[in-house]
């Protein structure tokens, strides 16, 4: 299986994890095993558990991690606590999440994530459950608008949702290019003339809805944080503002000492921070990485201990 994946922000991730060769580590998003392999190579008596909900990724990661102290499990990272408990692992010394859609999922047109090639409108990372076509052909205009606005930050959400409802009344919307053309027809001409494809926010929003990505991230962060050993590190790579905002707010809450109202002059809560921020500001790709890996352009890495 062709599965190209250049790991984003690899060295900053390895530095952030502060790997102990005897430690236990979790990669919640195995993908093409780019990060997983480099983590596992640095372990001696330690162990790596790699998770991914995509069966294609699991097959590739299993092959690429052969001979290394690593185990791959097909599951969404929101189930990390359960998986670790079943494996008899009480805590991990570090965990990594590389969020969003993988290069393989984008490059494989048949998966239906890309608006650059015609394919069935699928977008399921796990290849199970309702597809993107199911959503766009069944949800009412109000719900479609909410998804496009909340998950895509799409300024023309109402107009696009209206075009989708009108188009599907004539024939089902079953392919990626069908949807991309509907979006293009719904936005003002000035939007269509811009360098970025006008469908990009719609595709992001529907993908997030199909895969419940923000719910999974919210639950997964809590689950993984609770599995960290004292001094354990959590590294999270985000690719859009919705993910990054969620991660930033979680990290800040965990690192916060006082929870008293801001107008209260003296602390009475006796709060103790659960963690400390290793990165006050997110780490982004340097010029060398940007030149060799286009996917790294929007990547932001945050690290917590």
Please place each PLM-identified region on the residue numbering.
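S-adenosyl-L-methionine-dependent methyltransferase catalytic core, i.e., the SAM/SAH-binding region
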Residues: 1-305
């Amino acid at each position: 299986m062709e599965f190209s994946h250049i790991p984003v922000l690899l060295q900053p991730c390895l530095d952030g994890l502060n790997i102990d060769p005897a430690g236990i580590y979790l990669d919640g998003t195995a993908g093409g095993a780019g990060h997983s392999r480099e983590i596992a190579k640095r372990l001696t008596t330690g162990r790596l558990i790699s998770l991914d909900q995509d069966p294609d990724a699991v097959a590739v990661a299993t092959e690429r991690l052969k001979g290394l102290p690593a185990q791959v499990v097909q599951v969404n990272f929101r189930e990390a606590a359960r998986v670790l408990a079943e494996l008899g692992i009480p805590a991990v010394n570090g965990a990594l999440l590389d969020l969003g859609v993988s290069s393989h999922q984008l490059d494989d047109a048949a998966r239906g994530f890309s608006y650059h090639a015609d394919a069935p409108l699928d977008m399921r990372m796990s290849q199970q459950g309702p597809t993107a076509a199911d959503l766009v052909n069944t949800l009412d205009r109000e719900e479609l608008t909410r998804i496009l606005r909340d998950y895509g930050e799409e300024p023309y959400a109402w107009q696009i949702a209206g075009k989708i409802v009108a188009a599907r009344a004539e024939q089902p919307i079953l392919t990626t290019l069908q949807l991309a053309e509907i979006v293009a027809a719904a936005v003002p001409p000035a939007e269509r003339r811009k360098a970025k494809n006008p469908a990009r926010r719609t595709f992001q929003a529907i993908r997030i809805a199909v895969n419940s990505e923000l719910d999974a991230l919210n639950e997964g962060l809590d689950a993984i944080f609770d599995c960290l050993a004292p001094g354990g590190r959590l590294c999270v790579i985000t690719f859009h503002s919705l993910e990054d905002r969620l991660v930033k707010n979680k990290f800040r809450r965990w690192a916060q000492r006082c929870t008293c109202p801001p107008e209260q002059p003296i602390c009475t809560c006796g709060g103790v921070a659960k963690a400390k921020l290793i990165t006050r500001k997110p780490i982004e790709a340097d010029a060398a990485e940007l030149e060799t890996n286009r996917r790294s352009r929007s990547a932001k890495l945050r690290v917590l201990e």
